[in-house]
Structures are given as structure tokens and as C-alpha cells.
């Protein structure tokens, strides 16, 4: 088992890519926008068209990763290039995702051309997009300093009914990654099923406790309006009410379906990113600093365009 683990590490942990020109044009990161016409087409025509989005996301991108040369270049972290166009890709996505989710609920609820199976599968395909693209974009936005970008992040996470992820990720995961205090560092030999059942309550609990602790330091109660859990809850409620207004109880069920698939994608990524990796506890009682070898990386070109370089995870923890 250990030999298999070592081999896996050699294949997938490619740390310290070379710093070259490296900056990928902003238009390249607009690849996920192709999902929009695919989902609209699938919702209108049904049948085998329902599987186009999963085929594109899971199969076509994977084939491209095998055919396209792995990229070992990296942008200069001290580059002064204007990233406004890169950010514009992120800013546009919440509107596109909002449209896609509620378009699907509207079409399914108000037209009869899709069977129940096609309807559920369409929402699962949308859930793949909400998770793989929406949450990935939300992750990038929540790390920005602008309050407006954090709002966009919260809106995207609200569409997955997983708003507390921002608190858990920023205040818990980045501080405790690779330790027992971080729920989303998967233990060596832990199955994904066990991991998933463990992190669902653990992440919510740790995020809530972290916000309570933060508020206590400024002498405010947990019920304070400065607790972002108010925002997380209100956004989730708005999306659920809108789902009900468009499609009734079935509309709410459809919304829950895509949200669950989105959460599943997020936690699959969390499971892989630090699986079996730990930081040493030093003699001073503190954990060693987070280093490149505390994250799994993948330098595959196509999937990194789709996931806006999420798989270069060592870079992310070095400079979040």
C-alpha cells in the first residue's frame, strides 16, 4: 500500500513549476462559459443531449489533458500585470450560473417534454457545473480583498447551500491544513465516503465556532448582524423561495439536487488536495509552516483552464 502511495505521489505532486511568462490570457479561463449553451440546448431537446455537459466536463477535458503537454510554467508572483480581464471572468459567472439553475427549474416545471429521469439528470449536470465551476470561482473570489467580490462568492456558495464554506476555508482550513484541527485534510487510508460523512457536520461546526470566537473578541454575541451566517442563511433562503415560486415543491427538490451534487464535487476536491499529508508538530508546540509538499498538485493544461488553476494547490497555500 505504501509503495502505491509513493507512486501516486510521484505522479501527481509536481511542485515548484518553472516561472516563465506564465500568464494565461483571460479568455482561456472563459472555457467554463461553454457550459451555458450546452445546458440550454439539453434543457430544450432532452434525450441524449442531457449527457453532453457531463461528457464535456468529465470525458472531453480529461482526453485533452492526456493529449496536451503538461504545463510546468508559472506566472511571476511579482508581476504587475493588470488582471481586470481575468477578474471579469469571475464577476460574470454568478449571473450565468443563476440563469442556468433557474432556467432549468423553469423549463422542467413548466414544460412537459422532459421525463422525470431526464429532469433529475439535467439538474445533476447543472450540479456538476455549480460545483466544479461555481464553487471554484467562489473560492477564488472569497480570497479577494474587495467586499463586493466576497459578496459574489457568497452568492455562488448560496446556490450550493454551502455558504459556511467561506468561513471554514479562510479561517480554519488555511490555518490548520495538514493537522487534526482541519476537518478537510483527508486521513491516509480514509475512504471518500467516510470523509464525506465526517466533513459535512464538522465543517459547519468549525465555521460556526470560529465566527463565535471572532465576535467574542470584539464583545459581540453570536446573534450579531456582523456574523456572516446571517448572510449565508438569507441567501440560501432566497434561492429556495425562488425555486418554490418557479417550480413549487418539485422546484425545491430540483434545486436541492444540483446543490448536493455541487457539494459532492467540492468535497471530492478537498479529499484529494491534501490526502494523507500532515504537518509536523514542532518542539515549540506549533505546527511547521505549510510547504509545497503539503498539497497534491496536477499540472494538466485543460482541466486547469476549466478550474482556473485550482489544481496548482501548493501555489494557493503559499500565497492565498
Where are these regions (language model features)?
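Membrane-helix interface/capping segments
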Residues: 67-82, 278
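Membrane-proximal soluble regions of multi-pass membrane proteins
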Residues: 148-215, 278-320
Amino acid at each position: 500500500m505504501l509503495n502505491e502511495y509513493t507512486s501516486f505521489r510521484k505522479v501527481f505532486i509536481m511542485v515548484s513549476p518553472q516561472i516563465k511568462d506564465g500568464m494565461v490570457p483571460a479568455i482561456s479561463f472563459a472555457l467554463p462559459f461553454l457550459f451555458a449553451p450546452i445546458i440550454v440546448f439539453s434543457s430544450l431537446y432532452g434525450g441524449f443531449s442531457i449527457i453532453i455537459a457531463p461528457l464535456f466536463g468529465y470525458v472531453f477535458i480529461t482526453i485533452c489533458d492526456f493529449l496536451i503537454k503538461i504545463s510546468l510554467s508559472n506566472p511571476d508572483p511579482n508581476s504587475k500585470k493588470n488582471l481586470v480581464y481575468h477578474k471579469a471572468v469571475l464577476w460574470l459567472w454568478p449571473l450565468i450560473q443563476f440563469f442556468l439553475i433557474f432556467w432549468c427549474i423553469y423549463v422542467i416545471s413548466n414544460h412537459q417534454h422532459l421525463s422525470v429521469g431526464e429532469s433529475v439528470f439535467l439538474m445533476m449536470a447543472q450540479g456538476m457545473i455549480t460545483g466544479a465551476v461555481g464553487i471554484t470561482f467562489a473560492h477564488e473570489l472569497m480570497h479577494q480583498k474587495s467586499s463586493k467580490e466576497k459578496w459574489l462568492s457568497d452568492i455562488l456558495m448560496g446556490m450550493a447551500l454551502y455558504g459556511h464554506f467561506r468561513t471554514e476555508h479562510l479561517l480554519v482550513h488555511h490555518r490548520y491544513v495538514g493537522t487534526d484541527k482541519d476537518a478537510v485534510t483527508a486521513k491516509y487510508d480514509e475512504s471518500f465516503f467516510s470523509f464525506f460523512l465526517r466533513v459535512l457536520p464538522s465543517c459547519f461546526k468549525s465555521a460556526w465556532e470560529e465566527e463565535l470566537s471572532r465576535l467574542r473578541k470584539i464583545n459581540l454575541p453570536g446573534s450579531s448582524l456582523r456574523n456572516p451566517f446571517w448572510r449565508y442563511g438569507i441567501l440560501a433562503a432566497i434561492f429556495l423561495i425562488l425555486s418554490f415560486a418557479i417550480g413549487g415543491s418539485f422546484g425545491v427538490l430540483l434545486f436541492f439536487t444540483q446543490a448536493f451534487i455541487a457539494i459532492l464535487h467540492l468535497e471530492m476536491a478537498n479529499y484529494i488536495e491534501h490526502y494523507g499529508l500532515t504537518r509536523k508538530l514542532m518542539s515549540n508546540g506549533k505546527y511547521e509552516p505549510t510547504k509545497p509538499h503539503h498539497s497534491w498538485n496536477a499540472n494538466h493544461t485543460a482541466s486547469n483552464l476549466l478550474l482556473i488553476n485550482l489544481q496548482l494547490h501548493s501555489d494557493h497555500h503559499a500565497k492565498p
